[in-house]
Amino acid sequence: MNAAIIFVLLFVLMLTGMPISISLGLTVLTFLFTMTQVPIESVALKLFTGIEKFEIMAIPFFILAGNFLTHGGVARRMINFATSMVGHWHGGLGLAGVMACALFAAVSGSSPATVVAIGSILLPAMVKQGFPKGFGAGVITTSGALGILIPPSIVMVMYSVSTNTSVGALFMAGVIPGLMLATLLGLTTWWKARKNDYPRMPKVGWGARLKAFRESAWGLLLIVVVMGGIYTGLFTPTEAAAMSAVYAFVVAVFVYKDMGLKQVPKVLLDSANMSAMLLYIITNAVLFSFLMTSEQIPQAMADWLIGKGLGPIAFLLVVNVLLLLAGNVMEPSSIVLIMAPILFPVATKLGIDPVHFGILITVNMEVGMCHPPVGLNLYVASGITKMGITELTIAVWPWLLTMLVFLVLVTYWPPLSLWLPKALGVM
């Protein structure tokens, strides 16, 4: 009964148009002060202790690094390198877009940032070369979602904070699924381009490819710094995030020199605004998780599902459907922070690995970024292409279907996400 009251109250507040962060906080306060005897001091204490976790600091640092890389010329050099490698195949610039998104995802940690950085440069070039606008938008919108699967990933950090799962293990677990999804999206792009005889670029020699690689090497080296540092134990994921922010600043301002010192304050301010928004959501989500735990709702749900004889296969199917539906009304950060603390105890009781479960949730969030009505990547791509959301939704379907097939693969083949972290000894 209490669970029903909590969720009805939350959805009613959300339907009024109230921001999700305020809806969460108001739901918790209303329920606690009208239905329980919890002292107000404990709520205030939870607000501060809930966001004291060291791992949370990774979020603003990865956001800052992504902003420096977006404005610092790294994306343009990655696109040039990707184009030199695959531009001569069917749908050359489209394939270059997939590859560039995968490379930028490995240094940014954010899907919308990837779409902005790659799409703002590549989409006008694709239209100019004769590609239909819908084709380019479909490629970049869906490939940009790799930003939260290929590590580092802000969504994985949020899952880690919500469930106390190792961030390092999650990052390593996202590598193979991320590369596989990039390959599948590339194959979809190639197939559609070949079917419709879209333009190809002239093949360039290895000298030009080597030159493009050297120009992009400073950006690509950040992948080695972050992942290599975590794997070797040189620094924690949070320290890796701080290192990536400093490294991105140095590369953007002093190496590539595409950004002057006068632009740095604006980048810092934009990063602070985005970080404040996410941290405010996290703060209220921590309160919501505290309420769930105090009312023993996750435990009750786990006992009920197990009592009904629901096994891991059926449970994971239910989770996928639930998360895809949630993606229609909420953005990924809110979904992870609300749903992970509820679903995680059930998953562990059913013997599902926490790292595998985290990758499954992340892939669901990727799909949610690309379908209406609140798919963030759709709105970002719409701003770049000036296409309507309905038109964009139709354009992304071939790639979205590929992502749904991949979701099934990730869900029911755990070694896909677990093999690498186990082989590296991080879990």
Regions found by a protein language model. Name each.
Residues M1-M427:
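Alpha-helical transmembrane segments of multi-pass membrane transport proteins
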